[in-house]
């Protein structure tokens, strides 16, 4: 399996009592109808670590139904130990997802040997296609490229790696060393176009929640060799990504993330995102006003 294109890491709307599954269905339907190559609801953007295992399964059941074979359905484990990870992979397999993204161990900063041992224990019990993942903003460490290389060489079910490090030198290493064997996928919207130009296969991104077909257009332009046009579109969106970064997305995970993505989705599409799931705080009024200003300047609202 070769993963290519734009996979939407979707936001999760809530009610005061739980997940707003009807709202989720609307979000997923818009993305599938727009022509995105895949959906990834139980993601960091989708607040996977704040969902119960039962909620994660139901979210993926909705995604599987909405996708209807028109888009890949990818599930994220959101777990930090091998036993819980194996359990979530089993549950997702029963749902019939296409690919599972393995959340790396978090809370403790692990060394190479511990990370490698974690992957071996999980993959020895896993036969579904798997994406490996690095997100040092959440785990406190970046997974060495060599660890991914070792794991990919040992386990044929590993089909890709998602990079949310924000470290472009590291990303280039992934493309150079693993790009012939695995699909290298960018995890930050701000770096999507530069990554594609340098040989990445696609991205797992939050922008599709509220950007319409813009992210797909970026992908198309690069693939057609229209690099200057892709860069121009990228630069047009930079005020948005710089604002998102300034509010905690890049550099550290601030308390305003991913609520800004949810607010943007609500402002653009009119879908009630409901309250953030605690302990995430609501977006402050000053940030809401700034986001509204940027979205208006982009012609999105």
From Swiss-Prot:
It is found in: Cytoplasm. InterPro entries: Aldolase_TIM (IPR013785), DapA-like (IPR002220). Signal peptide: none annotated. CDD domains: DHDPS-like. It is an enzyme of class 4 (lyase). The active site is at 44 (charge relay system), 107 (charge relay system), 133 (proton donor), 162 (schiff-base intermediate with substrate). Its EC number is 4.-.-.-. GO terms for molecular function: 2-dehydro-3-deoxy-phosphogluconate aldolase activity; 4-hydroxy-tetrahydrodipicolinate synthase activity. Gene3D superfamilies: Aldolase class I. Keywords: Cytoplasm, Lyase, Schiff base. Pfam families: DHDPS. GO terms for cellular component: cytoplasm. Belongs to the DapA family. Homotetramer. This is Uncharacterized DapA-like lyase Pars_0992.
